Amino acid sequence: MASPTTFAKVSRFVSRMYGRLFSANPYPLYKFLRTRYPLLRTPIGFWIATRYADCVDVLRDKRFLAFDLRALDAFPPDDGLKSMREALQHAIVFRNPPDHTRLRRLMTTFFSPGVVDGLQPRIQHIADYLLDAVEARGSMDLIKDVAFPFPIDVLAEVMGADDADKPMFRDWMRTLGVPLDPVISANDPGVEVRQAIADVRRYFSDLAADRRMHPREDLISIMVAAEGRGDLQTEEELVFSAMFTLLAGHETTMNMIGNGMLALFRNPDALARLRSDPSPAAIESALDEFLRFDSPVQVTFRTASEDIELSGRTIPRGEHVVVFLGAANRDPLRFTDPDKLDITRPDNHHLSFAGGPHRCIGEVLAKVEGRIAFETILRRMPKLALADPNPKWRPAMSLRGLESLPLTF
């Protein structure tokens, strides 16, 4: 447990970094850091990397390991955070070789382009179903009505859940999404988080037991088969790999849809261009630009396994690097006119899916979800318009998304 002095330093640093003003527009601060302090050691002992080249080096260098969750001991005590840490230590994103290699090989099999292509009819059905529910109203909150439930319902089908269970999945994500940015949440959601984790564990344990007897073509069945081969070594790996797949695949896709749609409305030329050419290639190019321009995930973390030289500085063994993906994506040394939304941008190698050994496994699924969501919304709602020109952003440390996005059509 860290000392009260350390807790105070953390609280002061975080309150300055992650207030409402920062959440509304973090990019001026990113520019300042990139220009003046591109590799900065903070008062709480974390290094901040904001240049594209440095971020790529950290992500690709295998000496930088998955973030050591014990570093969270430096943050003020939070029962919800503690419960999440205990669960997520089993998730692939916080594992290192050989466990990471074993788990990634398993998960990559299911999220391959061929498998995801087969999911497209169901993903399209979910998008149409959600829009059917709001079409007669003439208005909607894109976040509440579409962007929030859409990826949850897709992932529930990926897992092999019944339609009747989807509302329960949505409730879990409302609860478990809170401690993903624990240092800025107003209250400690410990009781609710513990209960949600217990419910998730029970649900996926029961679903796995059913799939052992009655396998299907879903992710839980693949995990059960892997368990039989020894590729999954514990019940915790199965349960919490499923839980983290939900968490990682939900929040990021929700933010991609919300952030991207807001970017279109604030750049009417881009919106007009996409409406005139809604081809899959055009939408896919636009999606990459949405991801670069306003990344759903702003930061990721790595831990040095040994002393590592980075841009003339030494990152000591055991210290942590905060890789600011959102800052790297606006680096003028890598991107021409980085603060401009250009949905035809060539050579758009953004870092919103991170990179290296821990590059996002769900990238293919996320892009298919995004393409179907934008194509369907723009096709079915040609008069779509922004109802609130200044929607509120959720205050957050690592994720960037809107609280709501009211639209009329």
Q: Where in this protein do the model-derived segments appear?
A:
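Cytochrome P450
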Residues: 1-409
